[in-house]
From Swiss-Prot:
Record's keyword annotation contains NADP: yes
Species for this entry: Saccharopolyspora erythraea (strain ATCC 11635 / DSM 40517 / JCM 4748 / NBRC 13426 / NCIMB 8594 / NRRL 2338)
Binding of substrate, residues: T49, C50, N51, R52, S109, E114, A115, Q116, Q120
Protein's gene: hemA
Region described as Disordered: 428-468
Name of this protein: Glutamyl-tRNA reductase
Pfam family, one: Shikimate_DH
Length: 468
């Protein structure tokens, strides 16, 4: 089996590509089930945010799994596979573990250190768990990633290096408007991103908020929450956008809808002050033509991506990265140690069978042996065998936790002629430093999977069946 991460993010793809591939909440279950219907995918969950779309999967073969994931994403986005893979990356084995831990820690975010991604991973896993597309491998991986993210935020000050994309967008709006205190804001969308934006607006001292949402009850619920916190707020239907925009100084959009929600027809640019749009949707909620209107400024994910692409983490990011590296080593060591357990179990089973056979032989040779004597002999033989096996079985578990340690389990199976099916161990290609090798662009990986082209991508792990 192979652990794969296949995806796109702000690091590898422009917003125009990301918004085509973005998977809305109402589509996520369908995409997950389509992945599981493919020939090589055994488990899967998908993280789709404003900055990334990533599939975490357990596949029977590396290249088969890669082809399955890329074809599903291409079909979903309506893109050609070759065009899409130019912007995609793949991590496998330990590198996939390291990537997810880094994402959970906020180290791979557009705004380094933002904590929102933790909730997004938790929600993504929850959807997959409910859909029945995750098994033991991804369950353990996702839960450990969430623990790593929490530890990083608890033990470092990485939060101070970046709150969220929302805070960065509102900081730009504050600059354009000369401050947000007392201003009027229209919030389009009342989902998780909308809730985060509402909280940021409240902290910025916004004067009043109107919430427009497709589902009226959700918009009213968010408005009530703001009113409870002392911010005047009300909710309107989406068909009231034009009048609400004419009233607002700031419009924050985060609907997750497919296609533009705000067009030039919604915006009046007559005798009024500056109007700022913070478009946090993926795909974008605001039509590109809106940015060309006089007096209008649009801050969107593409704007933030350009500005933050050169952002470098400070000392807290380095501390966070050290924690991630430590956690990756620990996780991989634990996985390798767990993988040798079937071999140890098979060895002890073989020893017990030998003891039982010898005791039966003793019974046939000495049928008159008294019961208490026979029982003491049996206990003695079993104690001797247990003591002989104790040191090597403990040691093999310790050695198995080191890079390349699976070879010790192989040696045990060979020496004691253990059934490889009974003592199956899933191998993972490891680098000398304990981190599994395994990252490349999807284009490189797909070329490496083509006949006659395997040498183009070095260090690919051995695969099952025809992919070996």
């Amino acid at each position: 089996m192979n652990l794969l991460t296949v995806g796109l993010s702000h690091h590898s793809a422009p917003v125009r590509v990301l918004e085509r591939v973005a998977i809305g909440a109402d589509e996520l279950g369908k995409v997950l089930h389509e992945l599981l219907q493919r020939d090589h995918i055994c488990e899967a969950f998908v993280v789709s945010t404003c900055n990334r779309v990533e599939v975490y999967a357990v596949a029977e073969t590396f290249h088969g799994g890669l082809e399955d994931v890329t074809s599903v994403l291409a079909r979903h986005s309506g893109s050609d596979v070759a065009e899409l893979t130019d912007h995609m990356y793949v991590f496998y084995a330990g590198a996939a573990v390291e990537h997810l831990f880094s994402v959970a820690a906020g180290l791979d975010s557009m705004v380094v250190g933002e904590a929102q991604i933790l909730g997004q991973i938790r929600q993504s896993y929850g959807v997959a768990d409910e859909a029945g597309t995750v098994g033991r491998t991804l369950h353990e991986l996702a839960q450990q990633a969430l623990r790593v993210g929490k530890r990083v935020h608890a033990e470092t000050g990485i939060d101070s290096e970046g709150a969220s994309v929302v805070s960065e967008a509102l900081a730009d709006a504050e600059t354009e408007l000369g401050g947000l205190a007392g201003r009027r804001a229209l919030l389009v969308g009342a989902g998780s991103m909308g809730g985060l934006a509402a909280a940021q607006l409240r902290r910025a001292g916004i004067g009043e908020v109107v919430i427009a949402n497709r589902t009226a009850v959700n918009g009213e619920r968010l408005a009530e929450s703001l009113r409870t916190d002392g911010v005047p707020a009300s909710a309107v239907a989406l068909d009231g956008l034009r009048s609400a925009i004419s009233w607002a100084d700031l419009v924050v959009t985060c609907t997750g809808a497919v296609g533009a929600v705000v067009t030039t027809e919604h915006v009046e640019t007559g005798d009024r002050g500056p109007l700022v749009f913070c478009d946090l949707g993926l795909p974008r909620d605001t039509a590109p033509e809106v940015a060309e209107l006089p007096g209008v400024t649009v801050v969107d994910l593409a704007t933030l991506q350009r500005r933050l692409s050169e952002q470098q983490g400070g000392n807290e990011s380095e501390r966070a990265a050290a924690i991630v590296a430590e956690e990756v080593r620990g996780y991989l060591a634990a996985q390798r140690s767990a993988e040798v357990t079937p071999t140890v179990t098979a060895l002890r089973k073989r020893a017990a069978e030998v003891v039982d056979a010898e005791l039966l032989r003793l019974d046939s040779k000495l049928p008159a042996l008294e019961g208490d004597v026979r029982d003491e002999l049996a206990r003695t033989v079993r104690r001797v065998v247990d003591k002989l096996l104790h040191a090597p079985t403990v040691r093999v578990k310790q050695l198995a936790s080191t890079p390349g340690g699976s070879g010790y389990a192989d040696a045990l199976r060979e020496l004691f002629e253990l059934d490889p099916q009974t003592a199956a161990v899933l191998g993972t290609a490891q680098a000398d430093d304990g981190r599994a090798r395994g990252s490349a662009s999807v284009a490189e990986a797909r070329r490496a999977g083509a006949p006659g082209a395997r040498d183009e991508l070095r260090d690919l792990p051995a695969q099952d069946g025809d992919d070996r």
